[in-house]
Curated annotation (Swiss-Prot):
Organism of derivation: Ralstonia nicotianae (strain ATCC BAA-1114 / GMI1000) (Ralstonia solanacearum)
Pathway: One-carbon metabolism; tetrahydrofolate interconversion
Keyword Iron appears in the UniProt entry: no
Assembly, per entry: Homodimer.
InterPro entries for this protein: Aminoacid_DH-like_N_sf (IPR046346), NAD(P)-bd_dom_sf (IPR036291), THF_DH/CycHdrlase (IPR000672), THF_DH/CycHdrlase_cat_dom (IPR020630), THF_DH/CycHdrlase_CS (IPR020867), THF_DH/CycHdrlase_NAD-bd_dom (IPR020631)
GO CC term, one of those recorded: cytosol
Keywords, ordered alphabetically: Amino-acid biosynthesis, Histidine biosynthesis, Hydrolase, Methionine biosynthesis, Multifunctional enzyme, NADP, One-carbon metabolism, Oxidoreductase, Purine biosynthesis
Name of the protein in question: Bifunctional protein FolD
Family matches, as Pfam families: THF_DHG_CYH, THF_DHG_CYH_C
Family: Belongs to the tetrahydrofolate dehydrogenase/cyclohydrolase family.
Function: Catalyzes the oxidation of 5,10-methylenetetrahydrofolate to 5,10-methenyltetrahydrofolate and then the hydrolysis of 5,10-methenyltetrahydrofolate to 10-formyltetrahydrofolate.
Reaction(s) catalysed (UniProt annotation): (6R)-5,10-methylene-5,6,7,8-tetrahydrofolate + NADP(+) = (6R)-5,10-methenyltetrahydrofolate + NADPH; (6R)-5,10-methenyltetrahydrofolate + H2O = (6R)-10-formyltetrahydrofolate + H(+)
Amino acid sequence: MTAQLIDGNALAKQLRTEAAQRAAALTARGHQPGLAVILVGDDPASQVYVRNKIKACEDNGFLSIFDRYPADLTEADLLGRIDALNRDPRIHGILVQLPLPKHIDSHKVLEAIAPEKDVDGFHVANAGALMTGAPLFRPCTPYGCMKMLESIDYPVRGARAVVVGASNIVGKPMAMLLLQAGATVTICNSKTRDLAAHTREADIVVAAVGRRNIITADMVKPGAVVIDVGMNRDDAGKLCGDVDFAGVRDVAGHITPVPGGVGPMTITMLLINTLEAAERAAEDAALAA
């Protein structure tokens, strides 16, 4: 068996085309979707991520504001800028690129973003809403993973899903979205005993640890869907995920590649979250008129 690839680039292109059409309709009504991205410091990976986000906005008819600050920016100044963006009617989404310098409290910064503009879905109000099944925003990476499952018409209801990784950014919200879709979900973490015993029983495996080859072929149930969220480098410096792609591909039914899998979907769902925020703002403006 050779797994079918879930092509994140192709799916992202389709969803971005739809988002661009919705953005154009909003812009025609005077409500162009707007995203503000804040980068503090000069982390090379962060610069690449931010550049890709800004380009995605520009390519799809979104207003984008890029605020770049030196690493010695004070926490107070950053909070002041976020407050200004919270009050800016042109901006519907605010994203602070992580990680932040050590002297800045990331939690305090993320909580300063107005929940209705928290397009990453990290604010405690949005995380809590996700728990209740009525999220204002779904975190971008898990949201993209769910769209990938949807794209192959996978019957999530009743499936056994294992999420490897328990971060607030991917693992926990991924588990919640799968649970809400009707899956029976297990979350594995660094303390999990016999990881393979869990993954071998799974119909869906989501790997989100940031450790190369943590999922190998002998750990995967034949025919399972394997979604690789990891972003690592192999010994030759080539981009790779958390999954031993060459081996697992011969066992799984569907698999996402790295690169070209979850990555493009994450930025796409950021656009969609921003678009949905703009649509809500337009509705509120119409009601207030």
